[in-house]
């Protein structure tokens, strides 16, 4: 695979494209794209740009350099702090994680993690989560929230950071990333869309021990139609910062890759914010001309950048643009003047004397609970196992039913997530083999930088016992044994297991023998066995899901602080299940083909240059399963509830602008509207996620292009409406270097999942 060399530095060159299949001996390459496009201050950015331009014009060269790099400080524990310019009232920026709340501090909330949000398929809840989480970051003096996560998208099912993102699907990811960004920035903090781009595994994500970081070799069509798709939505939503990724893309490090930063992000997408690197990912000062605006931490960056400008290697205009983009983001979200707390004001060392800063607000509590409820997915429910109806006796089994033994000052909230003691000493990004179950206690998020410490953990057993006290239910439990005794009087046996994932290492598999054995052992003794899995990604269930005594299965994902309480509401029918899978669950690992394992997992000792060819193109997850006619165990978009729904009255309106070719308008123009009616034809309240899939010529059989979640009482109907843009119908033309609508027939499918299609029609273009 190779990006051919450009004939000039123009951003619109036809030469800047990849050939999908070439001789294996050839190396993928990224062409240089220069100069770095300066900020234009267009549209909604105009006022912020004008203010930033005025402020930066008063800065010296040293002051501009100072705000482009991170400094160590004892004043706070922010992940990064930029330099300040006190004489001009520039206070600097505090940059900090995490994906489910402010980490390394106290008096904050632990929101549901990204994957849990993806399973909710709920746009409004995603926005509300983003808003209230953003307010907590602001209260702590965090200027830049290092999220949300649009990459890893999830190409490799065992990848360690898939849980930080929302879903494997680029359309769903784009919508939820955009909702999060709008919420964060309306709260007054700068959102960061990350990691740009191709950061699809943890193994060899950075250079270690003389081995280069893995190179994600991706063709131009796949970049646009799959991996860059959610970043397009993020930029359109106004993301004020972006983070480049650790690994190489087409054999150039992403944070030095001018094709990615200058050509795609700042050029094609017209990104107006600033680009920062992932921590310690800088390689040389040439990154500045490649489009990088901020370095964390600084190291020798400031000295080298100043020297490069003085000797003409880097232009002063590039430095001015770097500083302007950073300051403009500050103005853009309203952090100037007295509108924002002192940077890092609530980010103190927890072991040192400090004045507590309360970040939580009462208005967020129902949002956190609703979010926890909404991301649970019911996959099996037979023999009327659920909802529970005042059982006389419940038996609870499994290590995941209770809290970890410690919650103290752990800044990464590892707790039970360290499935092996050795994990604490292992080098991130290296090949390791850890237990796939975190047996130290229930998991409410994945591990490391994407996780924060919760104010409390509502664990399943405690929540069940609280309900049992009201119902006079007798509760048995055994949380340690792999083959526990079962009281024959149990109305139901609940088995709690988990599947952990964490930044730094990819998973060793998609199931573990101990947990599977526990389920089978309980099911052999209990006729009503209900399995609940807290999972940080895909978890195989074929080992036991067809056992006649396994009556119900819940994918509980990563619900945050209200985990147990939310689950009990669902188990007892106080709330209804409405989540849908944001990924496919296969029968076996082999169903994935070559993308099951991380690239270079079998690297030879003398191979210092690991390569990862994305030869599958856009065919991942359900797109791939559909194309190869592989039947999954549970398909993308699947989820049961306590009622059923009927779909009817499909109709399609098309605009005169829906024509073949490049088109005269924007790719964001609405060119079609699809209507349908959803009716609750069951006997209980519920919510259905109506999903729209397009069959685009010369593409995967179905691609998600719309979804609407509608709550209905029994017997009630409601219309759903899907507005489709020109981009939704387009493919990326690698010759024209434009989004193009092809001539042909486009199938339109509306249904309850990617395989449960209820209504279909065609659009001819």
From Swiss-Prot:
Its EC number is 3.2.1.21. InterPro entries: Cellulose_deg_GH3 (IPR050288), Fn3-like (IPR026891), Glyco_hydro_3_C (IPR002772), Glyco_hydro_3_C_sf (IPR036881), Glyco_hydro_3_N (IPR001764), Glyco_hydro_3_N_sf (IPR036962), Glycoside_hydrolase_SF (IPR017853), Ig-like_fold (IPR013783). Pathway: Glycan metabolism; cellulose degradation. Gene3D superfamilies: Glycoside hydrolase family 3 C-terminal domain, Glycoside hydrolase, family 3, N-terminal domain, Immunoglobulins. Optimum temperature is 40-60 degrees Celsius. Keywords: Carbohydrate metabolism, Cellulose degradation, Glycoprotein, Glycosidase, Hydrolase, Polysaccharide degradation, Secreted, Signal. One of its GO terms (cellular component) is extracellular region. Induction: The transcript levels are constant during infection. Residues 1-24 form the signal peptide. GO terms for biological process: cellulose catabolic process. One of its GO terms (molecular function) is beta-glucosidase activity. It catalyses: Hydrolysis of terminal, non-reducing beta-D-glucosyl residues with release of beta-D-glucose. It is an enzyme of class 3 (hydrolase). Glycans are attached at residues 66, 124, 250, 304, 311, 349, 549, 588, 657, 681. Optimum pH is 5.0. It is found in: Secreted. Beta-glucosidases are one of a number of cellulolytic enzymes involved in the degradation of cellulosic biomass. Catalyzes the last step releasing glucose from the inhibitory cellobiose. Shows higher activities on cellobiose and cellotriose but lower activities on laminarioligosaccharides and polymers. The biological conversion of cellulose to glucose generally requires three types of hydrolytic enzymes: (1) Endoglucanases which cut internal beta-1,4-glucosidic bonds; (2) Exocellobiohydrolases that cut the disaccharide cellobiose from the non-reducing end of the cellulose polymer chain; (3) Beta-1,4-glucosidases which hydrolyze the cellobiose and other short cello-oligosaccharides to glucose. Belongs to the glycosyl hydrolase 3 family. This is Beta-glucosidase cel3A. The lineage of its organism: Eukaryota, Fungi, Dikarya, Ascomycota, Pezizomycotina.
